[in-house]
């Protein structure tokens, strides 16, 4: 909101400087973005009158003018196209100083003496008009200093308002704030009701009362829109960053800036029948005032006549019904449109207007009649004309209402940290226009006026007290809390530590949506019934995920498409399994891996990551809480995973996750041209383990035996290792599979497994007989249980 300081001070004028006023507004939550002077720095410029003009004898585009300053006549050479006898203009006399340190001196132009300069608005930095002289009113007092006449010792102040403070999008609203801040009376202009001098009306029918609870219209006949807008109004509009167009538009803009109520003037001759406030028909066409043709949607509120739409309600009028210089009769509109009906409509059509800006933030629903009378009075004063009666349609049941709010002094003290005297609380709230009634000692009932639609709770009133009292006066108290240390189970690993573990292994954390495309749901969980949203953000975010894999794989695609060849990502979040009546929301930890095993470097190769690399990462996660031995990896089946590279992860017989390569068919469908590995774990299972136990380091030597075993190809390495552990005795300290071989020299139905076993006794040296006996027991058990024999 941009406004003229002098305009504001015409309503309320505390005895403070501009700088202090600006600082106080900012401290009260009305942040001032900029302060711009109304004109440049100049002196020696007065109101002049052109008495006569003659053609320059030696220049086609120059005129020799006789100009009066009220006491003397001066010869001035001027090239402005609009210079003419009788015109009153800014006259810079000899010795004047214009913006940019430009001093006016006596000069000769093409041999003709010139004693001064006739000025445009741009030359005084008092506007943008640079195509001709600045034309002053016919009654401008000749000889008066132009700064005083145009009140140019002024500034435009721009305030950046938060969306909840739509009540301050007017001079009246800002004046209320300033009056409350400085405990100064606000002087409103006297707005008298305009009596009707004819009885012509246009019937008004509101077919969408919820969207338009109040609509006022008035016929004003015989206006003369060729009359210029008064300079004082043009200047106030300019300093509010609004361009002057014609008298009717300028007046509606002026009243909107002054009171905060948007208005619109229609050309009465272009209205067929009466006014209908209705929802648009789907695809209905309307050419707007800016020349843009829009195809209206059915959710758009329009002002229409009996044949066609005339305007988008609260946004912009139509071109064919807009007023022009030839308009003689107008229909003036002043209405209250519900915020919901206007919100977002301007943006959806690529528009943003002063009217939509206000309606989206809220307009006082009691203001429409006062604004109508104000605009009517100004129209009759400036353009002439005859006013008819006001037609008003009101749906009381759809008008907003604000319930009284109870305020407690104890709550004020609790939230602000200081005691404000009861009398001061009442004074501050009353200054805002709130009706305060004492209910008990330290408790009030506050009636909120219609212009403060942002106040509905006790905390809103306390916020107002803090603003008016002064945020800088509130005591500084640092928060205090008695924090007891929280016990942490030693056998439990928390999520932040798991995140750090995966980051240390080269992963990056991803955060994806819980909503996925139903098509992706079917790809990763074929046959399962998705949990669909009733009101999805978009069609491709309509299902709740049953796995974290779709989001991670989509993120992988995004990275691969941007030449990121080595991708390792993990995510923690909820998966949603089942339907509403039995919905299970389960925290999961998942990852996706693709690309080379190691980052590019001179000392390592470019081998691609494989199943066992990812399995090592998963084992690091499973072993984080000290319970790796409780988990087993068994061949598994999953519709999204490769049938030969899938591991089902179990703990005590419970399924806790899956690990594997993306199924080749799924990879082809998703356009993945390289192996992609994924894992997913139930977070609760991998976060709990066993208490660590201390084992004293033995001072005695280790004994190692390496065994090369032959086993059937369908026997898993883990089954072999389990049998070895069962028979290796209590002094086994390490068991490691270090080679697997299938091929030449081996039965095609068999495979070779090389394992290393290490024993160490805590209190003595083991001898070969003991180790050999244990080794024999291991081999015997392997042969009996798994048909695994020692390779010879």
From Swiss-Prot:
Cofactor or coenzyme needed: Mg(2+)
GO molecular function annotations of the record: ATP binding; magnesium ion binding; phenylalanine-tRNA ligase activity; tRNA binding
UniProt subcellular location: Cytoplasm
Gene3D superfamilies cross-referenced by the UniProt entry: 3.30.56.10, Bira Bifunctional Protein, Domain 2, Ferrodoxin-fold anticodon-binding domain, Nucleic acid-binding proteins, Phenylalanyl-trna Synthetase, Chain B, domain 3
Entry-linked InterPro entries: aa-tRNA-synth_II/BPL/LPL, B3/B4_tRNA-bd, DNA-bd_dom_put_sf, Fdx_antiC-bd, Fdx_antiC-bd_sf, NA-bd_OB-fold, Phe-tRNA-ligase_IIc_bsu, Phe-tRNA-ligase_IIc_bsu_bact
Record-listed Mg(2+) binding positions: 454, 460, 463-464
Reaction equations catalysed: tRNA(Phe) + L-phenylalanine + ATP = L-phenylalanyl-tRNA(Phe) + AMP + diphosphate + H(+)
Broad class of where this protein is predominantly found: cytoplasm
Domain of life assignment: Bacteria
The record's free-text note on cofactor binding: Binds 2 magnesium ions per tetramer.
Annotated ranges, domain FDX-ACB: 698-791
Biological process according to GO: phenylalanyl-tRNA aminoacylation
Domain tRNA-binding positions: 39-147
EC number annotated for this UniProt entry: 6.1.1.20
Quaternary context: Tetramer of two alpha and two beta subunits.
HAMAP family reported for this sequence: Phe_tRNA_synth_beta1
Protein name per Swiss-Prot or TrEMBL: Phenylalanine--tRNA ligase beta subunit
Organism annotation: Pseudomonas savastanoi pv. phaseolicola (strain 1448A / Race 6) (Pseudomonas syringae pv. phaseolicola (strain 1448A / Race 6))
